[in-house]
Structure formats: C-alpha cells, structure tokens
Amino acid sequence: MTEEKDEYGTIVVARVAMEENMFNPQPDIPRIRNDSTHSYQQPESMLEKLNTYYTLAVVIAQLTIGVLGNSLTLVADATRIFADHLELFQYDRAATPGKRLTEIITVGITNVILFLLFVAFLLTASGRAATMEFDINRLYLSIGTAMAMTANTLQTLCHFRTWQRERSYHSSLYTGSKRNQLMHGFVYHFIAYFVLVSSLLIIVNKDYLIADVITTYATSLLILANISSIGYQLYHEYFSLEHPQDEYEPI
C-alpha cells in the first residue's frame, strides 16, 4: 500500500514538473526562427506582373524587328530593356539558402551573358562604322522605336514604384540613396529616350546611318550601367547568404 502511494506521488510530481516546463520553458529550448536577415518581401502586384509580361514581349519583338530591319540599335535596346528589368529583380530573402543560391547563380549567369552581348555590340558597331556598308529598313525601325519608347516609359514608372519600397539591404552605390536613385531614373531613362529619338534621323534620311552606330554605343553604355548595378546586388546577396546573422532567438 505504501509503495502504491509512493508511486502515485512520483507520478503527480512528474506531471506537475511537466506542466511547469510546458508553461515556463527553459531559455535554451524551444527555439524559433528569427528572420532578422530575411526582410519581408512584398508580393508582386498585378501591374508589375503585367509589366514583366509586356517587357518580355517587347524584348522578343524588338529583337525580331531589329534583325529583320538590320538595326543594331533596336537589338541593343532590346537587351538594355531586359537588363534594366533584371535590375529590379526582387530576391526572395525568406527562401531557403539553397533556393536563394539558385537565384543568385541564375542572375549571375544572365549577367555574364549580358556582358558578352555588351562587348559584341561594341565590336559590331565598330565594324559598321569602319565600312558603313549596311542598310536599315525604315519601316521596321519606326515600329521598333515606338515599342521601345513605350517600354521605356513603363520601366520608368516601375523604377519609381520600386524605389518607394525599403530595400532589404543598404548599399553605398547609387541605389543606396533616394537622391541618386532619382538621378538614375531621370538621367538613365532620359538618355534612353534621346537614343531612341536620335534613331529617327535614319527614318528621315538614310544619309544618317551613322546614327545607328552612335546610338548603339550609347545604348551599350547603359547596358554596362545595368550590368554593374546587378553585379553589386549579387555581391550583397551572396555576402548575406554566406555571412548570416544570428537567425534564432529564444521564445
């Protein structure tokens, strides 16, 4: 009888201890994930999704029209539009390290391809400038220029919409301050407009074929600006992946 009471008392004490641990856990356990290094990512709006689809459509159309019309400016500007859109890519910092690394590698490979295209545009434009033995279909050039100007306007609006959000990291480059962001918006896209308008000289008079070479050089420099910005973003994303802060905190 005494043994049964002792056993019953042990069970009661153990149950009370479990309840105390349940409602007053030790500071070491349990531990929950603290996403201090993974900033909240706002979901992509319908406008941004439509802009993405439209941008891809314009890039494909411009590449096709540029090749058919033999306009190096249209081909280079299609690449610039894609590079500028890629610069706005929102990395998912709430994803697993494996998925984040996949994003970084994919964007990095794309950035390398863009750099190779940048070099190809410079070499091709230099070859055209040396011989001037090329012709451009003015009808294709007119259609492609109109599409490019529309896409440039939408990208300007998307840039300003993105800059209103708080970035997941603080950079010291031009993307780091609102002032320099606005400078990028006005200067970059103003130059893009100027390049496209300059290409209209060819439509007026074919004697201005040299404008296709000059605008290709200018567009290539804009592509290089995008490549540099994307590379800087990749550096910060990879650094945050390799050197995370304390991701856990006690309840």
Curated annotation (Swiss-Prot):
What sections of the protein cross the membrane? Answer: 56-76, 104-124, 184-204, 208-228
**UniProt keyword S-adenosyl-L-methionine present:** no
Q: Which GO terms describe its cellular component?
A: membrane
Alphabetical UniProt keywords: Membrane, Transmembrane, Transmembrane helix
Q: In its keyword annotation, does this UniProt entry include Transmembrane?
A: yes
Taking the first listed entry, what is the main subcellular location of this protein, grouped into a coarse class?
membrane
Protein topology in the membrane: Multi-pass membrane protein
Entry-linked InterPro entries: Cation_efflux_TMD_sf (IPR027469)
List where in the cell it is found.
Membrane
UniProt name for this protein: Uncharacterized protein F19C6.5
The taxonomy runs: Eukaryota, Metazoa, Ecdysozoa, Nematoda, Chromadorea
